Amino acid sequence: MKKKIVAGAVTLLSVAVLAACGKTSGSDKDIITMKGDTITVSEFYDKVKSNPSAQQVLLNLTIKEVFEKQYGKKVTDKEVEEAYEKSSKAYGDNFARVLAQAGLTEDAYREQIRTNKLVEYAVKKAAEKELTDENYKAAYEAYTPEVTAQIIKVDSEDKAKEVLAAAKAEGADFAQLAKDNSTDGDTKDKGGEIKFDSAATNVPDAVKKAAFGLEANAVSDLVTVRSNQGQASYYIVKLVSKTEKSSKWEDYKDKLKQVILTAKQNNTSFIQSVVAKELKDANIKVKDAAFQNLFSQYTQTNTSSSSSK
């Protein structure tokens, strides 16, 4: 799946000028000259600094510097290059165009990848601190062990209803129906058979829920799944067998560990709280009133986290 390339927060010119302002105290260096007038760095800075895009680029730059100092040795150039090449291959011939549309050069995108990986590392380390018995037990309660099921995926609702009727008919050969009608390339040739538990990421949540609610050999009603783009697919699920759940959460410790870590690493509030803590520990001071609210989303997160303890 292609990972979306996020647009640069501000034009390269703005970034360069803002950076220059930070390094040149009170600079009135000309950046544009014309007949009878000039535009200085300080004039441009005064106009640009209140722009939301400029605010965002300064926030990104601050986060980059803070995480680079704290975790810079934890992310290698090789990791960054591998992630870059993965994106490049995913977009193919369109990669250069996608970068241009996002306002990014190749080097700027590599830098963005590196910053993301630094934050990901910090979030992972913070998530590991959440591996408590209490959280293991909570994850266990929500966990459903592996089931074996057969699925048929159909893109047309009318066709799906026809296949559903055939699948529920007495003596129906579900495996053959899957081979003849399913559009799911991973399971079609296997008669729709697939194994998964509640932590699986290769099966839609609605399909998992339908399977977990069935008895052996029962067939579900039509399950509708919509993509992020709103496109609907229709699933028919037959449960083949269930695995009996152990009464001891320790029996699933490795699996539950990944469940807990993944949940934290995908939780926006948790990620924000990690960034907030790093910014607080870095003792960030805002020297220009135009940027006084720059870190508000993180200071609020920090306050909320503290008050909830």
From Swiss-Prot:
Annotated function: Plays a major role in protein secretion by helping the post-translocational extracellular folding of several secreted proteins.
SUPFAM superfamilies associated with the record: FKBP-like (SSF54534), Triger factor/SurA peptide-binding domain-like (SSF109998)
Name of the featured protein: Foldase protein PrsA
Covalent lipid adducts (S-diacylglycerol cysteine), residues: 21
Lineage, highest ranks first: Bacteria, Bacillati, Bacillota, Bacilli, Lactobacillales
HAMAP family: Foldase_PrsA
Localization annotation: Cell membrane
Signal peptide: 1-20
Topology relative to the membrane: Lipid-anchor
